[in-house]
Amino acid sequence: MKTPIEVKILDPRIGTQFPLPAYATPGSAGMDLRAMVDTELTLAPGETKLIPTGIAIHVADPSLAAVILPRSGLGHKHGIVLGNLVGLIDSDYQGPLMVSCWNRSDTPFTLTLGERLAQLVFVPVVQAQFTLVDEFERSDRGEGGFGHSGTQ
């Protein structure tokens, strides 16, 4: 099932020189976002920069959100990850999609125009309503913190 999402092209090179984000295969969960930079951009070791993608989206449906995730190859091979780890796009946001790129490696990395730098994934959203209680119903796990669910 495909859900229509409104997209606005902010950079005229999208749709002419570079394709609109799309799923690469029928099983793809994410669409690649590209670096729509005017010139090559070098990230020094430890440096973070905000990179335009050339598009804006409006999800509109409050039961959906979008997340911007890193591309595994860039992170593993070059140390390029998202500066904010995950970007959350709320359904009512309508501004440009930007990618915070962080070079966590010890060597400079150069981004070129149109390079695929992140993925856009749409996810379902559940808005919770808190119910105040004095005590929780007991569970086997109880109050065990991080690493307390066992090893097997």
From Swiss-Prot:
What is this enzyme's EC? 3.6.1.23
Q: What GO annotations for molecular function exist for this entry? A: dUTP diphosphatase activity; magnesium ion binding
Provide the reaction this enzyme catalyses. Answer: dUTP + H2O = dUMP + diphosphate + H(+)
**Which Pfam families does the annotation name?**
dUTPase
Swiss-Prot/TrEMBL GO biological process terms:
dUMP biosynthetic process; dUTP catabolic process
Signal peptide positions on this chain:
none
Which keywords does the record carry? Hydrolase, Magnesium, Metal-binding, Nucleotide metabolism
Q: Which residues bind substrate?
A: 71-73, 84, 88-90, 98
CDD domains tied to this protein: trimeric_dUTPase (cd07557)
Q: Tell me where on the tree of life, at the top rank, the source sits.
A: Bacteria
Named in its record, the pathway it takes part in is: Pyrimidine metabolism; dUMP biosynthesis; dUMP from dCTP (dUTP route): step 2/2
InterPro entries listed in its UniProt record: dUTPase (IPR008181), dUTPase-like (IPR029054), dUTPase-like_sf (IPR036157), dUTPase_trimeric (IPR033704)
Q: Which cofactor does it need?
A: Mg(2+)
Per UniProt, the enzyme's principal EC class comes to hydrolase
Functional description taken from the UniProt entry: This enzyme is involved in nucleotide metabolism: it produces dUMP, the immediate precursor of thymidine nucleotides and it decreases the intracellular concentration of dUTP so that uracil cannot be incorporated into DNA.
| Similarity field | Belongs to the dUTPase family.
Q: Record's HAMAP family?
A: dUTPase_bact
Q: What is this protein called?
A: Deoxyuridine 5'-triphosphate nucleotidohydrolase
Origin species, per record, is Shewanella denitrificans (strain OS217 / ATCC BAA-1090 / DSM 15013)
Q: Where is the organism placed in the taxonomic lineage, from the top?
A: Bacteria, Pseudomonadati, Pseudomonadota, Gammaproteobacteria, Alteromonadales
In the UniProt record, what gene is named as encoding this protein?
Answer: dut
